[in-house]
Amino acid sequence: MARRKAAPKRETLPDPLFHSELLAKFINAVMRNGKKSVAEKIVYGALDVVAKRVQNKSGEQGDGDGESGGKAGGIKKRSLGDIRTDENARALALETFKGALDKVMPNVEVKSRRVGGSTYQVPVEIRMARRQALARRWLVEYANKRNEKTMVLRLAHEILDAVEGRGGAIKKREDVHRMAKANQAFAHYKW
């Protein structure tokens, strides 16, 4: 048992553009080496690509890749202008992001429990804060593993894939659920 008392929960300030605490935490998950402004550009750029793709799909069923601009820097600058000014695009992007996060969130996971000399993988239900943390972590991890040219496009396509029920993060969630289902017989060992 830990001898210290539990650390107090710190409140997260909402992000400046969407005023969403969920998105602020996601920006922090994308951030590396304390470079928050870079992480914000990546996330906002990805959400802009997501908004354009969803608008094109619902509107004209066009290609709407956002990749036709040539250099990746051009995409970032153009996308930041669009998402900062267009309220509908902002709402659409946020809803799509929340939908992706909901689909990636796992419900159960397995934890090791030692009973009488043997170790069992015991399925346990996950509390909401950990579900969200795992979903954020998996989205960023599997976006990094993609082959697109820039992180903006990798993250955007991972979010879009998650909404449609495919992609690396969704596969990870299914693997975790499959593992829990396979070890359901040991559920009575939970603590």
UniProtKB/Swiss-Prot annotation:
SUPFAM superfamilies, A to Z: Ribosomal protein S7
Disordered: region residues: 56-80
Gene Ontology BP terms: ribosomal small subunit assembly; translation
Gene3D superfamilies: Ribosomal protein S7 domain
Alphabetic keyword roster: Ribonucleoprotein, Ribosomal protein, RNA-binding, rRNA-binding, tRNA-binding
Entry GO MF terms: mRNA binding; rRNA binding; structural constituent of ribosome; tRNA binding
Pfam short name (any one): Ribosomal_S7
Protein family membership: Belongs to the universal ribosomal protein uS7 family.
Assembly: Part of the 30S ribosomal subunit. Contacts proteins S9 and S11.
PANTHER family per the UniProt record, alphabetical: RIBOSOMAL PROTEIN S7 (PTHR11205)
Protein's name in the database: Small ribosomal subunit protein uS7
Phylogenetic placement of the source organism: Bacteria, Pseudomonadati, Pseudomonadota, Gammaproteobacteria, Legionellales
Gene that encodes the chain: rpsG
